[in-house]
Each structure stands twice: as C-alpha cells, then as structure tokens.
Amino acid sequence: MTVFIAPNRKANGFNLSTMRRYTVHQQSELQTARDSGYARVILHTLTDHELPPPESAFILDRVFIRKEEFTEAEEDAELEDDDFGLEISKVTGRPAFLQDPIYEPSSRYMWLLQLNASELEDIGPRYEGIFEDGIGHLILDKQARKAPQGAEAGYFFIQFT
C-alpha cells in the first residue's frame, strides 16, 4: 500500500491551495476531500525493484515506519484525554485532531496511521511544510486485502491550524 499526494511544490515550500484539496477540518469536508483525487491510497504487491518515476515528478525520500511502544509518559498522556490521543506519529491508537474531530461513518474503514509534520521534517528538508505543520491521517479500508492490485485501499487527509 502506498499513499500518493499531490502537494504541488513551489520555491519555498508547498502550494497551500493544492494542499487544501486533501485537507479536512470538519466532518462536512470529508467526502469532498476523498473524492478530489489529490490524495490516493493504492494497493499493490511488493516488488524486488522500483519503478522509475517520470523525471518531472517530485518524489520524497522513501520512509519506512517502525512501530515502537509508547513510553510510560506517552501512554499516560494518550489516555489522559477521553476523546483524543497524542499529537505524535503513531500506528493505531487514538487519533489527535487539530480542528474538529473527523469520524469515518462506515465500519468498513479504520483509522490506521497518524503522521506528525514536525517529525517528518526531522527526516530531511524536502519534507518541510508538507502538512503545513499539521497531522496526516491514513484511514484503511478493511476490505482492501480482498481487492485487486491498483484498487483504492483507503484514504488520506491532513489537518492543520
């Protein structure tokens, strides 16, 4: 599974008007962002070699996410709020929202991953401004494992202040 976004790079960062197409600050914006096509989650098989992207493509460095257990302090902070989790990058757990909480209305989907922009920016300068200092959310389609290669496997959106 790979997440593709179309952030539209400009000289000093990313184009905010393009990023807004996959930004969801309130529940009523969710379906429009999902339908925009500016963020796609695609199912595919692993290969032993990469496909070369077009030369014009802006490709970020590949990042692998390693799951680590919460520290005791993080676990306490995660459970402190009845509604929201920590604003850190994490796999599963409870999502944190910087604006209104966003709920997937269908039980077919599950919240899978949260990426904090400041932690991505620590990887390298090409990530600076990628989520407008916000948080990216990956929602997984639980039926994706039955889908053919190239099918949508969920959706992705960002929130920022």
Q: What is each model feature region?
A:
Residues 1-161:
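Preference for intrinsically disordered or flexible, low-complexity segments
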